[in-house]
């Protein structure tokens, strides 16, 4: 294997208040079992990279949507209510922000990342830097 690409989630950011999120933000306080499984996925990939000296790239997806999406997600609920002429319930006075990513864009991004493994870089301290870190 030359390059391990794996799916993670924005859920790993847990209760972080600062937005936008950064790959440098702490992700050691998952607030759900789903977030904990994604964080453990990242830790396993990190270990695999160190043990077998191969690059790993984790892609943290944010609210993926598309034609076969989950009906319990907000965007489906909003669309359904709009079609029925019903009121959409808004929280936080409409000040909430959310990133939505269309599934076809996810697929294209994954394929592009799979096509080219990143070059290994070593920092001044001799330790690997991302994506090998």
Residue spans for each PLM region:
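N-terminal Rossmann-like NAD(P)+-binding domain of SDR-like oxidoreductases, especially those catalyzing
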Residues: 1-64, 107, 113-114
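A short hydrophobic/small-residue beta-strand
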Residues: 4, 88-89
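Activation segment of protein kinase catalytic domains
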Residues: 12, 69-70, 88
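A generic fold-level signal
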Residues: 16, 28, 70, 82-83, ...
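A glycine/serine/threonine-rich, flexible loop-to-helix segment
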Residues: 19-20, 71-79
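Short linear capping/connector segments at secondary-structure termini
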Residues: 24-26, 60-62, 91-96, 127-130
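Glycine-rich "substrate-gating" loop/helix at the edge of Rossmann-like oxidoreductase active sites
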Residues: 31, 61-72, 92-104
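Alpha-helical substrate-binding/gating segment
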Residues: 50, 76-88, 98-133
